[in-house]
Structure formats: C-alpha cells, structure tokens
From Swiss-Prot:
The gene is infB. One of its GO terms (cellular component) is cytosol. It comes from Helicobacter hepaticus (strain ATCC 51449 / 3B1). PROSITE patterns: G_TR_2 (PS51722), IF2 (PS01176). SUPFAM superfamilies: Initiation factor IF2/eIF5b, domain 3, P-loop containing nucleoside triphosphate hydrolases, Translation proteins. Residues 104-115 have a biased composition (Basic and acidic residues). It holds the Pfam family GTP_EFTU_D2. This is Translation initiation factor IF-2.
Length: 882
C-alpha cells in the first residue's frame, strides 16, 4: 500500500505541516513527527476530518466502550452519596435524647412560648439523663455522638472518677426537683449567672497555692454538669489556663532576682585578688565549645552551597568558626588558607565532618547582570539555529558549502574545519542560522558549545564509513543539550554507500530511525551533487515550525560568543549568535573579562549591519580584549558598568587561579619534590582564535606522562611578538608554537639573535605529531635484546696465568668477538659479561658460524663447566613513541 508523508499531504491540502500534524493527533492517528507517513485510508479519513469535522477513522465500538466505562463512575458516585446520607441518618438517630429534648425546648420557647409543652419536655429531660449515664460500656461504644458532645462527656467522666460520692446526692436532688418544678430557659440562665458570680468571689478571696487550681477545675466541671451549658464552661476552662501562665511568669521574675544576686556576688569576687585562680578561668574555657555546638544546632534543613566557594564563606554559611574548618581540612591532608576555593569533594567531606545536610549548586559561569526580559514584552518568532556536527571528513563543511553556494571547504587547511563558522541561509522566505563545528577529536569543547546554543542538530554521517568515535560524541552532545536531532546520511552517490548498515549502527547506540519505529529522521543526501539537500532544508523548517521558536525583542541584548580572535586592523573580534533582545551599533557590552562598545556588526558575508535580532549571527568589533569562547555577551547601560563588571570578573578569575597555586595537598608536595627528576618541555602557544587555542592546550596537556611533562609558560590569541621571544629565551629548551600565525621580520631577527626556535603550523595534526616526536626524544629510550647465537661447552682447558678456555661447538647463529654473552647452567643464568677472546684453532677469529668449533674465554670469569651454554646477544635502543 502506498504511503504519503504528512508534510506532502499538508502541501496538497494548502495547509501548514503543523496544522495537519495537530489534526492527525486529534484523530488518534499514530504519527510522531510532521514528516511521518500515512496510508491511503488514513489520508482519506484525515481529509474528511479537516473538511467536515467527522472522524470516520475511529471505529464505533471504541465510543461504546468509553460510554460504558463512564457509567459505572456515575453509579459509584451515586452509591457513595447514598452511603454518606445513610451515615448521617444513623448519626441523627443514635444521638442521645437529652440533647434533642434540649433543642426542642429552646425552639418551642422561642417560636410558640407554650409553657405546658416546655414543662413536659423538661420533666422528661432529667429522667432520661441518669439512664443514659448508667448505660453499659457496650452501648456507649456503639453510640455515635457529635464532636462537641464527646468533649463534654470526657470532661464529666474525668471529674466523676475523682469525686464519685458527690454525684449521687446531686442526682437524687435533680430527680426531686424535676418532680416538683421544671425550670424555664430564662431561669436556668439566671441560675448559672448567679453561680458564676459566687464562684468568682470565692476565687478572688482565695488566691493561694497552685494546687488549688485542680479543685477549681473540678468545681467548673460540676457546674457545667448541672447547668448543661458546655460552651460557656469551655471558655472558663481557658481562663483558668491563663492563671497557670501567670504563675510561670511569676517564677521567672523570682529567677531573675536570684540571677541578679549571683551576678553581684561574681562582681564582688572579681574585685577580690584571692579569687583570681585557675578554677574560674577553666570554667570560662569550658563554655567555648558550648557556643559552637549551639551555633551548629541552629542550622536546620539542607544548606545550599555554591560549588566555587571560599573557605571563610563556607564557615560563615554553616555558622562555624574558621579555624575549625581549616583544622578539618588540615587533618584531611589539605593545607588551605581562608581565601582558597573549595571543590565539590572538599565540600561534601566537610559536610560529613560537621554533620550537615547540604545541596551543592553549580557555580555561575559569568559574574554579570542577569538579563530578565520584560514580562509584558511580546515573544516574536525567530529563525531556528542549526548546528552541523559529525566525524572528520564526513562532509559537514561540504554540505554547508553546497547550501551557501560558495567554496569555503577548499579554503580550510587540509580540508578540515578548525573554527566554528556561523552563517545565515534563506529558504522559502524563511531564514535558518547554521553553525559549522570542527569534527577533529581535539575540538570537543567547540562541539559541546555548538550543541548548547542550538535548536536543531544535524549529525552528518558518511554512508560509506559509518558511525565513528566523534559521531557518537556529537550524538551524545546533542542529546545532552535536549535538542532535535536529524541524521544526514552523506556520500550516497558513492558505490559502496550502505545506508541500512548505518541505520543499524545508530540503532545499536540508541538512535532508532523513524521508519523502524524510532523518533529520529534519517535523510539520505549527497553534498557533492546536492541530492536530498532540499528535503533536508524542508525537514528543518518543519521541525522549527513544530518547536514554535520565539524570543523577546525587548530588554537587554544577550548573545553567546562562538569564536573570538585578534585581527590585524580590527583588534579583538568575536563571532556571536543572539539569544534575546536586539543589539545595536554603539551599545555598551561586556563578555567575561572583555568590555567595550560595539563599533561595527558584520554579517557572514562581511557586510555592515546596524542591528542584530535573535538567532542572528554577526562578528562584533570594539572589545577591549579577546573574550573566551562560550562567554555570555551582554549589553549594559553604559561603559562604566561594563568596565566594573569586567574588572570584577577578572579579579574573581585571578583569585581562583591563585587559590589553585596556594592550595596544596601532602601528596602533591611529594610529587613536586619528585618532579625534580622529570623532564619538562616549556612551550609558548600563539593561535589565531580562542577556540583553536583551547583545543591545542587541551591536546598538549594530555601528552604529559610519568617521564615528560609539558609546561605551557605562555599562550595567547594573535601574532608572535618580541615579548614572546624574550620570555622563551629565559627558559631552557623552550619552544614557540604558532597556529595559523606567522612571525614578522623583526620577530624573526630577534629569535635568531637569542637562539629561540619558532615552529608554525596550519593543521593541528602536524603540530601534535611534532610535539609527540619531541617528547619521545626527551624520554628514556627502549632497550631491546636480539639473540645472535648459542654455543655448547664440550671441553674446558685451564691455562696458568691466562684463565679457563672453553672448547665449544656453535649450535645456533654465530658467535662474535666482543659481544655480550650469558653463561647458562642447567637453564639458569650464572654469569653475564662479554667475550674477551675468540679463537678458531690457534688463530684469532672475529666470528664463528654455526657448525664450527671454537675457543671462548670470558672477561673476569673462569667458572666454566662442561655442558654449559653460551648465549650471545645485542642490545638495540629504540625511542619511545607516544
């Protein structure tokens, strides 16, 4: 059955691919991306759904199932409501008669005012009360009472357990009173008021010991039992609790008086010269650890600590003394001052030592103003940022070259990209920003930087070469950055291209093609003749449409520095890609330690532009120095603020660098002592761009080993200067490496005068190979042995004043005079030395071949026996290869 792509269906229908994708999702079709395929039936159903709104693709039995599943939910809700009502009915029926009677009396008094009915109800009330009190425990457990009633009953039970004999006469009197007269509601209120007034008088007349409060509390409960007015009595209970608090305050006043008396005595003792003894001092010393424990106890919950924090800042955060923190670090083998920075491991160890819960936050990379766009500012659509990644020589730059219709790839030395190139391309009236990253293994940081600023990553894989190491690394960078991934299968025009094998290799590492049920687009292309490139661009636009990429055009401009260099005639320049806001010519900007004012903005074609909008790519001039690649480039209000932030950042980085030099562990001290035996190669590196400089430094530092260490004494972006020559001349065996830079005439003359060697390169392969060769020459050579021959001892001759001569038969190879020899007896090496004399009959011989007899005498060794074996060998020295 023929299948139709969703994007092609949308074009025929005259709609956008995103609209068709959303409608297909509403219908329930199994589509994952806007470029997924549809069958003829699905396409017909989607066409009908868009035109009429009728979903004919979903079968009827699914709707029935949905309705049936909804019905039991209603039934359950009804049953739950009915069960709740039944519970409420049970509660009302099981409540006690006294309360219901009480409610009916109050209602009848207010509404009707008929005293005969009230008297009957009040007469019934005391008669029912004792019956309910004498009921068994089983009945009480089954009864369901209201929460207010249970509180009153609990209070009555507690009191009656303490005072059981007083309850019986009161009950009898109640019965007699109920027979004689049933009091009205107003009379009951009046009686309770009189009793409260009398009781307050008694309380005022007897303000005695605190134990009396328990008697008063029993009295309140008795009154509440007689008056049947629980709400008012509960308030009285609260008042009595306030009396207890007054007693506590009074105790505190007495304690304060005692403390004042003690302090007066201490002042008197201090003036007494006979009291200045060690006992008082010891007491003062003992209080110090109590203070520290109190401070530590105050900290509750996890403490958020930034990753790059100084020792004194850590002590302030955890509210501990600085000396204690330094002491713990010293015990762990780290000598640190208060201004040294703590790494993640040290923070975790300190938290364990001080028994704290901490959460380590990532340190902010840039110490500049946070750019917060206005909340009310509208978010406008921006072009997608696409990064092209992949292995070396898989055709990344050739693909971009075909898209831009220019010959950039031929301009790169060795045909490999060594910088990040950023370009703008227009397709179907829409712009796309492309970032080309190098594929060489030395440029890992550049690839990760390109993946972090992008929206869509195109991984170029050669169909004839398959998945390589840098391909896997690029895929992991893109996946970690959480961006859309499109895999372009390049070099499809070659005969040995095998796309199925490539798909299988990608599926093994977790990148399954869309056709195989995965979520990744695999597009066959040929950067040489342009096959499939248009399809790739359309896929990029469809992905961008689905992502709904938007950015604010208001607020401070914010960008990322992709590459920076020092150009002659322009000074420090930086290639940036905008993230938000609009950058204009003349804006004050800051990027890491660099600051300045935007003098000019140049697009990828070298033309001047006045402003740069989000996702735009341009080269900025006017900076004070070359910023580091990956730095945040941001506009500020004026030049003063820009300079302040750049200076703060420079000071912070300097302190961090000094911290690394001062903070030394005991193990590192031992290594520094042992490094006196190490051979070092001092180097000065100058490169044309910041990214290339970082890559070269990282690659060279990996070459250091146990015998040889590379010491980079100077580095920078720009040409080789005379100051570099003088610095190189001060250190022995030093070397200047230039990458894409050339020394001028005066620099060459000074280098020749001071005997400084300068090596320049345009390909990173050649630079690394030469440094490896230099390091191999500094390393101790490898000594290998080569066996030349063997001879068996057949007879020995002892000659006075000469020594022992062994008569031998050469059984393997040849025996040479002066060569090194081992004497082997019963398979064990007895002696190692050299042959001092070799004779054939009576004549001296230089060499005796296999099958001939000869006489052999060793230097300074005469212990030779019949049956011993002479084994001759040569030592061959070879240089180590890194």
């Amino acid at each position: 059955m023929e299948k139709i792509r969703l994007s092609d269906f949308a074009k025929e229908f005259g709609k956008e691919a995103k609209f068709a994708y959303e409608k297909a999702k509403e219908m329930g079709l199994s589509v994952k991306t806007p470029s997924s395929s549809l069958t003829q039936e699905e396409a017909a159903a989607l066409f009908e759904y868009i035109n009429t709104g009728v979903n004919s693709y979903i079968p009827a039995n699914k709707t029935k199932d949905k309705k049936e599943t909804k019905k039991p939910k209603k039934a359950t809700t009804k049953t739950s409501q009915s069960a709740a009502k039944e519970k409420e009915i049970k509660k009302t029926t099981t409540t006690k008669a006294p309360k219901t009677a009480k409610k009916t009396t109050s209602e009848k008094q207010k509404d009707k005012g008929e005293q005969n009915e009230i008297e009957q109800d009040d007469a019934q009330f005391p008669a029912q009360a004792p019956q309910s009190k004498r009921a068994s425990k089983k009945v009480e457990s089954n009864d369901m009472t209201a929460p207010l009633e249970t509180k009153a009953k609990v209070g009555l039970r507690i009191v009656r357990k303490n005072d059981t004999p007083q309850e019986q006469p009161s009950m009898v009197s109640k019965k007699d009173e109920s027979k004689k007269h049933a009091p009205s509601y107003k009379e009951l209120l009046a009686d309770t008021a009189d009793e409260e007034y009398k009781r307050h008088k008694k309380d005022k007349s007897k303000p005695k010991v605190a134990t009396k409060h328990t008697d008063q509390k029993i009295h309140i409960l008795d009154d509440r039992d007689i008056s049947f007015h629980s709400d008012y009595d509960d308030e009285q209970d609260e008042i009595m609790l306030f009396d207890l608090n007054e007693r506590e305050v009074r105790d505190e006043e007495e304690e304060n008086q005692i403390r004042q008396a003690i302090t007066e005595r201490v002042h008197i003792h201090r003036k007494n010269p006979w009291m200045n003894e060690g006992s008082i001092k010891r007491g003062g010393k003992r209080r110090k650890p109590i203070k520290t424990t109190k401070n530590v106890d105050k900290i509750k919950g996890p403490i958020s600590i930034p990753e790059e924090i100084r020792v004194y800042e850590f002590a302030e955060l955890i509210k501990a003394e600085l000396k204690d923190v330094i002491k713990v670090l010293f015990n762990l083998g780290v000598m640190a001052t208060k201004n040294d920075f703590l790494d993640r491991d040290a923070i975790e160890i300190l938290s364990d030592e001080f028994e704290l819960e901490i959460s380590i936050q990532d340190a902010p990379e840039q110490n500049i103003i946070e750019s917060t766009p206005d909340i009310d500012s509208p978010l406008l659509e921006r072009p997608p940022v696409v990064t092209i990644m992949g292995h070396v020589d898989h055709g990344k730059t050739s693909l971009l070259d075909y898209i831009r219709n220019s010959r950039i790839a031929s301009g790169e030395a060795g045909g490999i990209t060594q910088h990040i190139g950023a370009y703008m391309v227009e397709k179907n009236g829409k712009k796309i920003s492309f970032i080309d990253t190098p594929g060489h293994e030395a440029f890992t940081q550049m690839r990760s930087r390109g993946a972090q600023v992008t929206d869509i990553a195109i991984i170029v894989i050669a169909a004839d070469d398959g998945v390589k190491q840098q391909t896997i690394e690029a895929l992991n960078h893109a996946k970690a950055a959480n961006v859309q991934i499109i895999i372009a299968m390049n070099k499809m025009d070659k005969e040995n291209a095998n796309p199925d094998k490539l798909k299988a290799e990608c599926a093994e590492i977790g990148f399954t093609p869309n056709e195989w049920g995965g979520e990744y687009e695999f597009i066959p292309i040929s950067a040489k003749n342009g096959d499939g490139v248009e399809n790739l661009l359309e896929t990029i636009l469809i992905q961008a449409e689905v992502l709904e990429l938007k950015a604010s055009h208001q607020g401070r401009a914010k960008a990322i520095v992709l590459e920076a260099s020092l150009e002659k005639g322009r000074g420090p320049v930086a290639t940036i890609i905008m993230q938000q806001g609009i950058l204009n010519v003349g804006d004050s900007v800051v990027a890491d330690t660099a600051f300045g004012r935007v003098r000019a903005l140049l697009d990828d074609r070298g033309q001047n532009i006045s402003q740069l909008s989000p996702s735009g790519v341009a080269v900025v001039t006017g900076l004070s120095e070359v910023p580091s690649a990956g730095a945040i480039f941001q506009s500020v209000e004026n030049d003063t603020i820009a300079r302040e932030h750049a200076q703060k950042r420079a000071l912070y980085l300097r302190q961090k660098e000094l911290s690394k030099s001062t903070k030394v562990t005991f193990d590192e001290l031992g290594e520094m002592v042992a490094q006196g035996n190490l051979k070092t190669l001092p180097l000065i590196i100058k490169a044309d761009t910041q990214g290339s400089l970082e890559a070269i430094k990282a690659s060279l530092e990996k070459l250091s080993n146990d015998e040889v260490r590379i010491n980079i004494i100077g580095f920078g972006v720009g040409g080789i200067s005379e100051s570099d020559i003088t610095l190189c001349a001060t250190s022995t065996n030093s070397l200047i490496l230039g990458f894409n830079v050339r020394p001028t005439g005066s620099v060459k003359a000074k280098a020749k005068e001071l005997g400084v060697e300068i090596k320049t390169y345009s390909i990173i392969y050649a630079l690394l190979d030469d440094i490896k060769a230099l390091l191999s020459g500094l390393m101790s050579p490898i000594v290998e042995e080569e066996n030349t021959g063997q001879a068996e001892v057949r007879e020995t001759f002892n000659i006075p004043k000469v020594g022992t001569i062994a008569g031998c038969m050469v059984v393997d190879g040849s025996i040479q005079r002066g060569i090194k020899v081992r004497l082997i007896r019963d398979g064990v090496v007895v002696h190692t030395g050299a042959i001092s004399s070799l004779k054939r009959f009576k004549d001296d011989a230089k060499e005796v071949s296999k099958g001939y007899e000869c006489g052999i005498m060793l230097e300074n060794h005469n212990d030779i026996k019949v049956g011993d074996v002479f084994e001759t060998y040569k030592e061959i020295t070879k240089t180590k290869i890194l």
